[in-house]
């Protein structure tokens, strides 16, 4: 019993930290063009696909913010700190089923973060399309990724 409780506490702590970092990074004012100490990249998007044959609709909305700023060398050997927050929400629905997926990730590094493409709705819908509505559905939580500045890939 204590083991389950510890895992639940750890999970809620991770969710809280992710939510806290996400809110903080999104609340930062955007860097002014030409500012030497900070740089911002913001990507927002939505897409929708309709399959008339299956009477299905797939929707995807995503947002990503990459923020970098100058920091003391004690904080980052490169003199900069790079932080990224990504949100992606997908939904596939047809008369007999509704599937939702959400991904939130936060990254922080002393090195520039690699550009990651947003998940593609066109690569996700074929998987959902081939599911049969009579299959038993199993509920599970989506994995959440929280990385600290000291972790390496």
UniProtKB/Swiss-Prot annotation:
Name the segments for region: Disordered. Answer: 107-153
Q: Which UniProt keywords are given for this protein, alphabetically ordered?
A: Transport, Viral movement protein
Q: What's an example GO BP annotation here?
A: transport of virus in host, cell to cell
User: Hey, what's the signal peptide range on this chain?
Assistant: none
Question: Which InterPro entries does the protein's record reference?
Answer: Luteo_VPG
Cystine bridges:
none
Any idea what job this protein has?
A: Transports viral genome to neighboring plant cells directly through plasmosdesmata, without any budding. The movement protein allows efficient cell to cell propagation, by bypassing the host cell wall barrier.
Q: Which family does it belong to?
A: Belongs to the luteoviruses movement protein family.
Q: What is this protein called?
A: Movement protein
């Amino acid at each position: 019993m204590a083991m389950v409780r510890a895992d639940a506490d750890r999970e809620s702590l991770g969710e809280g930290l992710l939510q806290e970092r996400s809110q903080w990074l999104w609340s930062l004012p955007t860097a002014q063009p030409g500012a030497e100490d900070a740089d911002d990249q913001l990507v927002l998007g939505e897409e929708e696909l309709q399959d008339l044959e299956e009477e299905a609709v797939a929707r995807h909305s995503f947002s990503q913010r990459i923020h970098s700023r100058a920091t003391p060398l004690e904080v980052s050997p490169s003199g900069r700190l790079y932080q990224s927050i990504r949100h992606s929400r997908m939904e596939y629905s047809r008369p007999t089923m509704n599937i939702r997926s959400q991904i939130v990730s936060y990254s922080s590094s002393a090195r520039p973060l690699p550009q990651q493409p947003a998940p593609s709705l066109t690569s996700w819908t074929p998987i959902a399309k081939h599911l049969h509505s009579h299959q038993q559905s199993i509920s599970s939580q989506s994995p959440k990724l929280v990385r600290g500045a000291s972790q390496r890939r």
